[in-house]
Amino acid sequence: YCWFCRAPLPDKAKKCIESWLKHCPNYTILEWNEDNFDIHQNGYTEMCCKEKKYAFLADYARLQIIENEGGFYFDVDVELVRSLDPLCSEHAFFAFETDRMIATGLGFGAEKHHPLVHFMLEQYAPLLDGKHGVIGCPQLNTQALLKCGLKPNGKRQTVQGAAVFPKAYFNPYEDATGRLYITDCTYAVHWYAKSWMNRRTVLRSKLTRPLHRLLADHPRIKGKVKGGV
């Protein structure tokens, strides 16, 4: 996992890491931070640090780390619910965040120097001078896999030898409604800590969950609301 900013890990992050230790007791867990990751390697990483956009720095860092080292990666707001051992036979795996978007923060893994991870990293090339702002990982991750044959349908599939899993595997928590849909195939739950958002935005998303649940349960209301905007 990545943890930049020199701040102590939040209690929720510690609980998630405890779940990793529980379900994968024989795995080595490594923290990547300013001491073992070169934050000055390009303009993009320097800009992310200077502007305290640590979540976007982690988006980039995780790809470079897994390309060079191999292994599994999870954000610190991801809780494991079972062992990752069945995934060790995969050359690489990724997961849908929505039916159309891939997000490596949910959890992903790959052998060292896997070409798809390298290609994902290459999507950052236009941003490396640090003069063009930041782009969230779902957009860039999905962009790379679409170029390699991904079908944006939310279904399990194989892309150039890598497994791509549906939402139920790594994203069973519906952040908009606050509902959790764990199944027998679920490996992990992404709790959406939203460390890259300001507190007001995070609070607003929590306050609107009852409305999103209502709209999800009553499609006719959703249609009326949409039509009235």
Question: Over which residues does each language-model region extend?
Answer:
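Glycosyltransferase-associated regions of secretory-pathway enzymes
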Residues: Y1-A58, F74-V229
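Small-residue hinge/turn detector
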Residues: Y60-G71
